[in-house]
């Protein structure tokens, strides 16, 4: 089978917010030190809080090694001796996508580049608790199988300080594959919500290569004002990329906003009891008389909400046909064993065989227009 699509676009994340450290006695603490086969290992885990009710955790894991296997700027295999990993010439020779970059500002001596996550973790362990302010963390989102389910992991590649007035946001950028049958409009009339049961591509291991993995996305138009002309134009614009008519698989690069918590909801009569509604009908009370103090939150959810198509590169003209028949696409969907976990997958994988994945960098110096900023 010869597939006619270009190299895989990694699913990238760009999270901006406040750092939240796990409790010291947490099952997954900020940093956990361990030893395996005589090698020191480190794992890191901390949250990026977008708001009081929306937060995502990012992570890193690495260990000491005699020889570091990496890639140079030409994507060629290189080997680095452990003792040489801080050498400036060595660091500069490594491809940017194989390095971890940290910049917590001039107070922390600016930009630092590491050829191992192990050293990046140690640096963050010492310095991140001393830092006050917002950060942006970027990296790759990976779906890891465990006992028949996928769990989303956000692997750190860079951490840097940002201005306090930068808008908090949990953003991912994904090349999403979908067709007409992927789009579920069941709740459109009642909730202004569309569910897209699409797919993303991910490198599995050297035996499997790149495979398609199911991923659900949501388009929520409940905040669009039908009386606002710009909102109407924006809605029509986005719908032409969502409510597609083709049966063959299409794909498009989307910016998505991650919601991992409870969303604030507007207070209205639907939240009143029958007795309270009767008082309003009789003019005894008004809706404001029953309005609770503070914000009202809905159910806790984890959703990736379609925000804006990224019309760059191969997608400059919009959505692209995947150029695959239905059977070809089905053959490329990854099927995991019900009892499989990531350790099973990684046993087959070797870093030196892992291909370079294209990275669609998320611009951090521009934000969507204010009128559109919260339409997701």
Indicate where each model-derived feature is located:
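OB-fold and OB-like single-stranded nucleic-acid-recognition modules
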Residues: 2-376
């Amino acid at each position: 089978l010869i597939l006619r699509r270009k190299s895989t676009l990694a699913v990238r994340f760009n999270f901006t917010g406040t750092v939240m450290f796990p409790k010291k006695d947490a099952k997954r603490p900020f940093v956990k030190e361990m030893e395996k086969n005589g090698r020191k290992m480190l794992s890191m885990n901390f949250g990026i809080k977008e708001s009081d009710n929306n937060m995502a955790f990012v992570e890193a894991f690495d260990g000491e090694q005699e020889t570091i296997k990496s890639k140079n700027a030409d994507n060629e295999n290189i080997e680095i001796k452990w003792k040489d990993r801080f050498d400036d010439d060595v660091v500069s020779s490594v491809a940017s996508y194989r390095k971890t970059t940290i910049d917590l500002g001039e107070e922390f001596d600016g930009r630092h580049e590491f050829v191992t996550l192990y050293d990046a973790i140690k640096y963050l362990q010492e310095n991140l608790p001393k830092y006050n302010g917002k950060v942006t963390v970027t990296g790759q989102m990976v779906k890891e199988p465990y006992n028949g389910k996928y769990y989303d992991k956000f692997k750190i590649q860079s951490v840097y300080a940002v201005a306090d007035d930068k808008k908090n946001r949990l953003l991912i950028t994904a090349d999403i594959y979908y067709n007409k049958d992927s789009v579920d409009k069941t709740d459109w009339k009642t909730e202004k919500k569309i569910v897209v049961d699409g797919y993303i591509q991910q490198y599995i291991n050297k035996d499997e290569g790149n495979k398609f993995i199911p991923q659900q996305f949501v388009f929520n138009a409940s905040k669009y004002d039908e009386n606002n002309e710009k909102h109407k134009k924006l809605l029509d614009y986005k719908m032409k990329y969502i409510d597609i008519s083709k049966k063959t698989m299409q794909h498009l690069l989307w910016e998505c906003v991650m919601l991992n918590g409870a969303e604030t909801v507007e207070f209205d009569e639907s939240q009143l009891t029958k007795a309270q509604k009767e008082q309003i009908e009789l003019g005894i009370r008004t809706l404001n008389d029953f309005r609770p103090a503070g914000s009202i939150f809905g159910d806790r959810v984890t959703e990736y909400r379609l925000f804006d198509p990224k019309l760059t590169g191969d997608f400059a003209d919009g959505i692209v046909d995947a150029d695959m028949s239905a059977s070809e696409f089905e053959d490329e969907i990854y099927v995991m064993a019900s009892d499989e976990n990531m350790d099973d997958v990684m046993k087959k994988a070797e870093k030196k065989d892992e291909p370079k994945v294209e990275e669609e960098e998320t611009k951090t110096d521009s934000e969507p227009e204010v009128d559109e900023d919260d339409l997701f």
